[in-house]
Amino acid sequence: MARTEPPASKPRVTRGTVYGAPGAPPTPRKAKPRWGRIALVIGGLAAVIVLVVAGCGYAYVTNLDEKLHRTDAFSGLDDRPGKSVSGTQNILFLGSDSRDGADYDPKGSPKTGAAGKNERSDAIMVLHIPADHKKAYIISIPRDTYVSVPELDGHGGARAKINAAFSWGGIPLTVKTVENFTGVKIDHVVKIDFNGFKDMTNALGGVDVTVNKTVTDPRSKRTFKAGVNHLDGDAALDYVRQRYGLPNGDFDRVQRQQIFLRALMQKATDSGTLSNPVKLKSFLDAATKSLTVDNDFSLKDMALEFRSLRPGDISFITSPHKGSQNIDGQSVVVSDKEKAIALWGAVEKDTVADWLAANPANNATKGR
């Protein structure tokens, strides 16, 4: 049976800018129904991920839907868009990690329940799917991005790193913070614990990633050699977690997460997986056990609507920033206001393809 988390109170959500200023609500989207035979199913993760997996039957996708954990991701958030998978979609992916302790709320202790004590979001991504459903864009927001965290249910109400919102107020406050930062309305939420990477990777028999230069993680003591590395579940978890010992720290970790998600998608959709029912079922079962989604999220509906997507149709982007600075005694990532407004404005206007064509360096596919 699906797990449901408790609701929170209900203050109003307003649209913001990349620096958190309030504004008018985003324009409602026009729905264009497009129904047909199921050919794809979305599994997922994150640190977060959308996987488009071909060859699953309608009944099996329905069974996967029933296995997903559910939460009231929009508790306390008013003026939500209508729930339809036709038209554009903006899906927030959160990769949570409980190993290192929580950030502390300026208004009190770390919130338990929706987020959970000692749980935080180490990967924050927005999946944007245009209205024609021919492409998809996964936009990473560095977890240390310095933003205005709005108040919700007595938590937040301060400037902080964006991932503090999850520790302070769980998924609802994270949704509100991301919407405030981007000016983009979130349609659905998918959260995965980083430990879910292990089971999904092992179910596929491991994945291959390319590393540019040999590097050792000082925490896990694992060495990733220059060239192609075959990662099992434990190695994959270390790969997406590492930031110490990397030339650009957390920025390289963001790119590693993007590289790993692409490798996982490619492995999950190759012929060796699709032609092996046992492997495919093992992977999808591992994914659904690790996922928490909003109450209206439907794998079945998304499998119908996004049936033409393949891993090669997905581009990875990082929200523009000016690098790290020291503010109030802590190292934070400073958003590039002008460039970020342009990117997130393109998401809102459904013109990301044009933005990416004008900014090709932001298509993140390099090895780390």
Question: Model-found features: residue ranges?
Answer:
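Non-catalytic, solvent-exposed segments at the cell envelope interface
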Residues: 2-368
